[in-house]
UniProtKB/Swiss-Prot annotation:
Keywords: Chaperone, Cytoplasm, DNA replication, Metal-binding, Repeat, Stress response, Zinc, Zinc-finger. The keyword Amino-acid biosynthesis does not apply. The J domain is necessary and sufficient to stimulate DnaK ATPase activity. Zinc center 1 plays an important role in the autonomous, DnaK-independent chaperone activity of DnaJ. Zinc center 2 is essential for interaction with DnaK and for DnaJ activity. It comes from Beijerinckia indica subsp. indica (strain ATCC 9039 / DSM 1715 / NCIMB 8712). It is found in: Cytoplasm. It holds the Pfam family DnaJ. GO terms for biological process: chaperone cofactor-dependent protein refolding; DNA replication; protein refolding; response to heat. The keyword Isomerase does not apply. The gene is dnaJ. Coiled coil: none annotated. Zn(2+) 2 binds at residues 159, 162, 181, 184. This is Chaperone protein DnaJ. SMART domains: DnaJ (SM00271).
């Protein structure tokens, strides 16, 4: 007979919370408890099924394994209790070993954890690239004991509790649970005479200074991997990696979109009407001339080719887009007001074609609407 889905057994959905699952388990357990159903074989079977479902789904790692493999996660290796315990350990290693950075034998060499470092740079540094110096605390292999954790001349002995496996099995109900050995804490060995420098850990914490090359063109979220610069491994295992995540500080003038840069430049009303030339600064610290054409409207963009950001690990370069923002004059003198009034009197549809066309279209729209 095929096993029922564990979520179905408890009467919960796959997205239920731990609290919801606990309430459902208590309700079902009370309903089918053998003491409440004496002599009822079906109740006994139901109760065992409920208990098995809850024992699996209430444990985060087991639940992840069940969601991924289903009942097959617990049936590998012959279906017996020993098969269950060993298969679960293997599955948990597959699921979580890489994340924790501890793949390998249970009491053998273990890889050190990866480290993450967040680095914030300026847009100019992202443009030019830089050689950055990092000082960070990290675990390194203890030189005094060469990572063994034992004092010079002493050797660790096999843990008598787990027999060097680093894990022990405990019987719970009709199945077994495998857990980390409480005596050796998963090492598989006991250090009777620990190294004084590291206290038996095999690693010590030190500050290290590293030089990191930030290449031109890095963007927010760029990840730089320094292999072997993470935490030291244990029992002779390799060191983890150091991952540097780069972010860019907001710039007061430029906004970035990929390799392109955008900049808003205010121009006067007369510059917009008559045309002219403005000088802008580019990201490389140089100056560039931008020709403003006659009749430029606010929001119009002018492109300066190859004045943007370099493309990471490429010879390509983005562009710089200058967006003109027409500034309306303020605090006018009497003479300026008179001149603007004269200009307005001389204005026609030709001088303001967009406005004239807009109001003409609006008038036609509402006249046609009222005539329907």
């Amino acid at each position: 007979m095929a096993k029922r889905d564990f979520y179905e057994v408890l009467g919960v959905t796959k997205t239920c919370t731990e609290a919801e699952m606990k309430v459902a388990f208590r309700k079902a357990a009370m309903q089918w408890h053998p003491d409440r159903n004496p002599g009822n074989e079906e109740a006994e079977i139901q109760f065992k099924e409920i208990n098995e479902a809850y024992q699996t789904l209430s444990d985060g790692q087991k639940r992840a394994a069940y969601d991924r493999y289903g009942h097959a996660a617990f049936e590998h290796g012959g279906g017996g209790n020993d098969g269950f315990a060993s298969s679960m350990a293997d599955i948990f290693d597959d699921l979580f070993g890489d994340v924790m950075g501890r793949r390998g034998g249970r009491n053998g060499p273990a890889r050190g954890s990866d480290l993450r470092y967040n680095m914030e740079i300026t847009l100019e540094e992202a443009f030019q690239g830089k050689l950055a110096s990092l000082t960070l605390p990290t675990s390194i292999t203890c030189e005094a004991c060469d990572g063994t954790g034992a004092k010079a001349g002493a050797k660790p002995r096999i843990c008598p509790t787990c027999g060097g496996q680093g894990r022990v099995r405990a019987q719970q109900g009709f199945f077994a649970i495998e857990r980390t050995c409480p005596q050796c804490h998963g090492r598989g060995e006991i250090i009777d005479d620990p190294c004084q420098a590291c206290g038996g850990a095999g690693r010590v914490t030190r500050e290290r200074t590293l030089s990191v090359n930030i290449p031109p063109g890095v963007e927010d979220g760029t990840r730089i991997r320094l292999a072997g610069e993470g935490e030291a491994g244990t029992r002779g295992g390799p060191a983890g990696d150091l991952y540097i995540f780069v972010s860019t500080k907001p710039h007061p003038f430029f906004q970035r979109d990929g390799a392109d840069l955008f900049c808003r430049v205010p121009i006067s009303m007369t510059q917009a009407a008559l045309g002219g030339e403005v000088t802008v600064h580019t990201i490389d610290g140089k100056e560039a001339k931008v020709k403003i054409s006659e009749g430029t409207q606010s929001g119009k963009q002018f492109k300066l080719k190859n004045k943007g950001m370099p493309v990471l690990r490429s010879r390509e370069v983005g562009d710089l887009y200058i967006q003109a923002t027409v500034e309306t004059p303020q605090n006018l003198t009497k003479r300026q007001r008179e001149l603007l009034a004269e200009f307005d009197a001389e204005s026609s549809n030709k001088t303001h074609p967009e406005a004239s066309g807009f109001f003409a279209r609006m008038k036609d729209f509402f006249e046609n609407l009222s005539g329907q």
